[in-house]
Amino acid sequence: MLFLHDFHVSHTTLHYNKSEESIEITVRVAIDDLEKTLQTKTSGKLNLGIQKENKLSEKYIKNYFNSHLQISLNEKKVTYKWIGKEIAKDLHDIYLFFEISDCHSDGKIESIKIENTLFLERSDKQSNIVLIEFGVQNYNINFTKDYIKESIIL
């Protein structure tokens, strides 16, 4: 007998690149979760990773993430730029790449605040795991429908 279970998770890594003075953001999520979420906000299927991919898929992804993954450095909201995407070898997940460049032009980064509501409108059971790698300091945070904001003092 087969039991189906509804489990949705995203994995996000924020890695501080000291030499570039940037924060590299990598998100891994199930293609199906991303497509179904964006399909409710757009017209038509995205068809990610196949030849018939919607030409506006990157725009839709960028807009969605800008609204649902907000990052502040030293209490100042920052914008991040789209780098690209890659389908995982298992063809189940997709990697999304973003970057915050010149992230401490105002001086030392003392705090990071994250508001993460990714895919929460799709499932109450959504779990958004975030790993922050900042030099020798690492932080793991699990965002859920009941826990969407966290501030880290570095």
Please place each PLM-identified region on the residue numbering.
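Bacterial N-terminal signal peptides
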Residues: 1-2
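N-terminal soluble domains immediately following signal/targeting peptides that reside
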Residues: 5-154
